[in-house]
Amino acid sequence: MATTVMALAEKVLERVYGTSKSAVSVTSGDGEKTHRHTHHHIHRIKSYDDIDEDESSLELIQIGAERTKNVLILMSDTGGGHRASAEAIRDAFKIEFGDKYRVIVKDVWKEYTGWPLNDMERSYKFMVKHVQLWKVAFHSTSPKWIHSCYLAAIAAYYAKEVEAGLMEYKPEIIISVHPLMQHIPLWVLKWQELQKRVLFVTVITDLNTCHPTWFHPGVNRCYCPSQEVAKRALFDGLDESQVRVFGLPVRPSFARAVLVKDDLRKELEMDQDLRAVLLMGGGEGMGPVKETAKALEEFLYDKENRKPIGQMVVICGRNKKLASALEAIDWKIPVKVRGFETQMEKWMGACDCIITKAGPGTIAESLIRSLPIILNDYIPGQEKGNVPYVVENGAGVFTRSPKETARIVGEWFSTKTDELEQTSDNARKLAQPEAVFDIVKDIDELSEQRGPLASVSYNLTSSFASLV
């Protein structure tokens, strides 16, 4: 099937580009797109400001031990996890290797292509707000023959634009942290005859149930966050030599932070003696945050002795309306209401458990902080498998009920403290704080094994159809 799809992709390209190897006019004087009239109009990139128009190809300078190597990380803001992972990898490269690598994080689709690739962020946000729509989209595109044909058609239409994106950054190493950024860049590398010269790796950012588009047999390495994902990679045709299981990349400032709970609580002006629960509303402050907060107040207040048995921190994200509503309440227990936070390692370090939806990044960070997790929701498809990943490993529980959530926290803070401690210990054992460093070290080893390359040429006039 894969061979058939590849042949289909190349036949489509032949129809679009033809077999001529003549040079292509790329821009008009005012920078607007130009079109070459063949059987179809061919959309071109907006400008090549950084390209010498007198040259038909671009040559990278000599690559040697003393030369900084370019690393291009492909991502998209479809959910916050992809950018967070990309930036974590970038920071880890800097910490481990200094100026040996120049790492660029880019959404090439958004910057270089047209619809639907340049509109994925808005489309994704719309669909996850209508979860049944997203569920249908996720599962209907899972069969290989469907997503391969879809991606082949897009590749045929936007190949030159993607090629231009790669030419601008001239990477020796490409890292994909998004499921839709394997097939098309790899096809472009094949058409440019660069697959054996440009290192291409995938870093999967879903903990369990990930979309099949994550897996492409043409990658040099596929970094999986769990054994469950590694099994899926092997099932989808990757070889064991291509697969590594290191964990989910978490930003180094979080993973290696040395934090003392008492000091954090003093800094954050929290009660020093009461156990604390962290209630997450995500970046957009979505979900039953207010209902859960009110339920927690009831279960964390000892009516008989008229005193609190716990305190609460609520992260409202960008939802200012929610933050204002919570701040207006006269709480019976200590409550901290926060907006969009950039220092989550401190708030996590100051708390004793967390309530959140099943986003992989938040789960990975919670495990590093040894926080027992109460999962209260998940996005169908890629987040569904995160629930058994947490629950079956004893690192937390799942319930959508605000009242049940509050009851569990109330028991953890009063009659079931041993269970709280055991769950915390299980979370710590499941954590992989060094994952991002293991990933960049392995990429560096792969790069060194290849040795210095004479040159890497991104040819502006190559005929993609010539491989048919």
Swiss-Prot record:
Keywords linked to the UniProt accession: Chloroplast, Glycosyltransferase, Membrane, Plastid, Plastid outer membrane, Transferase, Transit peptide
Disulfide bridge positions per record: none
Location relative to the cell: Plastid, Chloroplast outer membrane
One cellular component (GO) term of this entry: chloroplast outer membrane
Regulation: Inhibited by galvestine-1.
Residues that hold UDP according to the record: 82, 251, 361-365, 383
GO terms for biological process, alphabetical: cellular response to phosphate starvation; fatty acid metabolic process; galactolipid metabolic process; glycolipid biosynthetic process
Superkingdom of source: Eukaryota
pH dependence: Optimum pH is 8.5.
Location (main, coarse): plastid
Catalytic activity field: a 1,2-diacyl-sn-glycerol + UDP-alpha-D-galactose = a 1,2-diacyl-3-O-(beta-D-galactosyl)-sn-glycerol + UDP + H(+); 1,2-di-(9Z,12Z-octadecadienoyl)-sn-glycerol + UDP-alpha-D-galactose = 1,2-di-(9Z,12Z-octadecadienoyl)-3-beta-D-galactosyl-sn-glycerol + UDP + H(+); 1-(9Z-octadecenoyl)-2-hexadecanoyl-sn-glycerol + UDP-alpha-D-galactose = 1-(9Z-octadecenoyl)-2-hexadecanoyl-3-beta-D-galactosyl-sn-glycerol + UDP + H(+); 1,2-di-(9Z-octadecenoyl)-sn-glycerol + UDP-alpha-D-galactose = 1,2-di-(9Z-octadecenoyl)-3-beta-D-galactosyl-sn-glycerol + UDP + H(+)
One MF annotation (Gene Ontology) recorded for this entry: 1,2-diacylglycerol 3-beta-galactosyltransferase activity
InterPro entries tied to this protein: Diacylglyc_glucosyltr_N (IPR009695), Glyco_trans_28_C (IPR007235), Glycosyltransf_28_UgtP (IPR050519)
Induction trigger: Induced by phosphate deprivation. Induced in rosette leaves when grown in acidic soil.
Pfam family, one: Glyco_tran_28_C
Class in the EC hierarchy, top level: transferase
Annotated tissue distribution: Expressed mainly in floral buds. Detected in roots, leaves, stems, siliques and pollen tubes.
Enzyme Commission no: 2.4.1.46
Extra remark: Auxin activates expression during Pi starvation, whereas cytokinin represses it.
Family from the record: Belongs to the glycosyltransferase 28 family.
Biological function: Involved in the synthesis of monogalactosyldiacylglycerol, the major structural component of photosynthetic membranes and in the chloroplast envelope biogenesis. Can use both prokaryotic (18:1/16:0) or eukaryotic (18:2/18:2) 1,2-diacylglycerol species, but operates with some preference for the eukaryotic one. Plays a minor role in galactolipid synthesis in chloroplasts. Is required for membrane lipid remodeling in phosphate-starved roots. Acts as the minor factor involved in digalactosyldiacylglycerol (DGDG) biosynthesis in phosphate-starved roots.
Protein name: Monogalactosyldiacylglycerol synthase 2, chloroplastic
Source organism of this protein record: Arabidopsis thaliana
Gene giving rise to this polypeptide: MGD2
